[in-house]
Amino acid sequence: MAENSEGLGTVPEHERILQEIESTDTACVGPTLRSVYDDQPNAHKKFMEKLDACIRNHDKEIEKMCNFHHQGFVDAITELLKVRTDAEKLKVQVTDTNRRFQDAGKEVIIQTEDIIRCRIQQRNITTVVENLQYAFPVLEMYSKLKEQMTAKRYYSALKTMEQLENVYFPRVSQYRFCQLMIENLPKLREDIKEISMSDLKDFLESIRKHSDKIGETAMKQAQQQKTFSVALQKQNNVKFGKNMYINDRIPEERKENELKQGFEEEDENEEEILTVQDLVDFSPVYRCLHIYSVLGDEETFENYYRKQRKKQARLVLQPQSNMHETVDGYRRYFTQIVGFFVVEDHILHVTQGLVTRAYTDELWNMALSKIIAVLRAHSSYCTDPDLVLELKNLIVIFADTLQGYGFPVNRLFDLLFEIRDQYNETLLKKWAGVFRDIFEEDNYSPIPIVNEEEYKAVISKFPFQDPDFEKQSFPKKFPMSQSVPHIYIQVKEFIYASLKFSESLHRSSTEIDDMLRKSTNLLLTRTLSSCLLNLIRKPHIGLTELVQIIINTTHLEQACKYLEDFITNITNISQETVHTTRLYGLSTFKDARHAAEGEIYTKLNQKIDEFVQLADYDWTMSEPDGRASGYLMDLINFLRSIFQVFTHLPGKVAQTACMSACQHLSTSLMQMLLDSELKQISMGAVQQFNLDVIQCELFASSEPVPGFQGDTLQLAFIDLRQLLDLFMVWDWSTYLADYGQPASKYLRVNPNTALTLLEKMKDTSKKNNIFAQFRKNDRDKQKLIETVVKQLRSLVNGMSQHT
């Protein structure tokens, strides 16, 4: 049983080995067979038995397979026997085909002979080509030269000529066609020189026409660059908290009519920045320069180019006669010059030797002298400050543009200081008209206000500070008239306008502050002062207006310190800075006020004269009317009303005006008595005249203007009083006895005055008392008068001898 079980276990293993032998590559059978012998003893016998059994099985399968395919094999043999017949037929056909090929080969032999003859001809042609191989490149190069000439590729044509002369012509120089080509080359070179020179002339004419466009583009780019730099500086100043007035001097609402007006027609959208190469085709210059360089005549080309450009420079620098009339004339002049030198700068940097730095510097110095002379001459015709300002802005952009190209422009900025003085003069003329208009429109009455809004509106224009005035209830009146805030505003406008010119001059804040203060001083001391004086002297300006003018000048004088603070704020320069110029407004308004005071005195006296001219005395009346004359009472009432207006004036001014008026009235009354055309005066007329003088004395004693001490004002009439008392009392003995004594009762009576009046009364006595000589009293009075007249004459003669 054990053997059986062992045998049963071995059989599957042998089957596995057999399957592995059948399915494994022959090279790997060794290990498999070795495993047969590694097993139990006699295992290989069993394996051999198993192998024999497997072989028998395969033989049986092969036999079955052969039996299955035998009929097919028999059929194939039968078919093969049938093909033999067809093979014999095929042999006959192949033989026939071979015969026909032999017949056809005869024609091929003939064609082959023809080919041999062609080969011989080809060899001959090759020999000829080999002999002409040196001639064909010459012809090709010459043909290329013609094509280059036709295509206007002259520089390449010249290079081709050099190759022909140096490389190709020596190889075929023995041929006649080569000699003809050699003779034709100089003519071609001359043609190239003429054509290139013609192109250069066209180029020069083109850039002359397009210089203004080139210059306009360059100036616009310079302005954009400057605007960017200023904006960047503003940003930095804001970041570090610096004062912004110098870089942003004018408020936003005041920035119209700036330099951008010259280029505002351009599209402000983002666009490609054009360069001089985009606007001008410089290829003619390059070609001509290269051509003349190749021809060895570069110096001739350089001399011609520089000569022609100098001629164009003189034409560009020649301005139009009416250039000073509009800013466009100046702009066109500047853009042409900029365009010219931008082109020269480009030529300087892209070519070698055509123009040099020394040449451009010489050309620029010549041009700069001419430009300065032209601007100095034409700017002198400008009377519009806006035009002068636009000219300044153009000069600044012009200078900045050329400075960016390396040209020195310091002399242009020096010229701007000359133009600045002219600009200030035009501003002064303009503001003279502004001041005149303000004075013409003023009503010369205090500014009325009825509410807080109106009060703030005035305060916002003029720095008025008065605590007492602020405490007053509405409605109330400012002491000054409308012209004061208007003038103050216009002075600030003038400072703004003057500041506009100072921008972009590359000057320090201290220099700008000094310029502003000097120009403002000129405005105050010359323009405003002149306008005030002319206003004061106008015939239609009355006493009320003059009083208001004095009040106005007082407030304007007080506002000068605010103007100084205003300048300090916009320049950021402290008033305590050394060498800071002060404003002379104080002296200006003081002078104007003194002139107005003098005019008040003059007009007041003129008004008194007008009233005095209305006097209509009856110098022969026997008795007085018993009341003062009507003209005099009207005059006194007028003086009272006028002196009430004077209450707003400084005390000394009102007192001086009042004293001057009383003295002038006293003098006018005295002159009326002593008038040479008045021949006779009666005692009744003297008494009536005395009534008028009494009214004058009463007026003086009523203190029409406060501030007089005692009877100071009455002393204005002391001469008249003593004279009239002398004649009214007829106190000649006392006068003659005390004459010359300091304590004399009639110290103010001049003997000559008394003599003149006494003679007028003497003549009246004679005329009215023809028969009075028969009365004793009248005779005694007449003798007394004659005696007094003699004594007075002796006093007068003594005074004249003493004198």
Swiss-Prot record:
It is found in: Cytoplasm; Cytoplasm, Perinuclear region; Cell projection, Growth cone; Midbody, Midbody ring. GO terms for cellular component: exocyst; Flemming body; growth cone; perinuclear region of cytoplasm. The keyword Protein transport applies. Keywords: Cell projection, Cytoplasm, Exocytosis, Protein transport, Transport. The keyword Protein transport applies. Pfam families: EXOC6_Sec15_N, Sec15_C. One of its GO terms (biological process) is intracellular protein transport. InterPro entries: EXOC6/Sec15, EXOC6/Sec15_C, EXOC6/Sec15_C_dom1, EXOC6_Sec15_N, EXOC6PINT-1/Sec15/Tip20_C_dom2. Component of the exocyst complex involved in the docking of exocytic vesicles with fusion sites on the plasma membrane. Together with RAB11A, RAB3IP, RAB8A, PARD3, PRKCI, ANXA2, CDC42 and DNMBP promotes transcytosis of PODXL to the apical membrane initiation sites (AMIS), apical surface formation and lumenogenesis. Belongs to the SEC15 family. The exocyst complex is composed of EXOC1, EXOC2, EXOC3, EXOC4, EXOC5, EXOC6, EXOC7 and EXOC8. Interacts with CNTRL. Interacts with RAB11A in a GTP-dependent manner. This is Exocyst complex component 6.
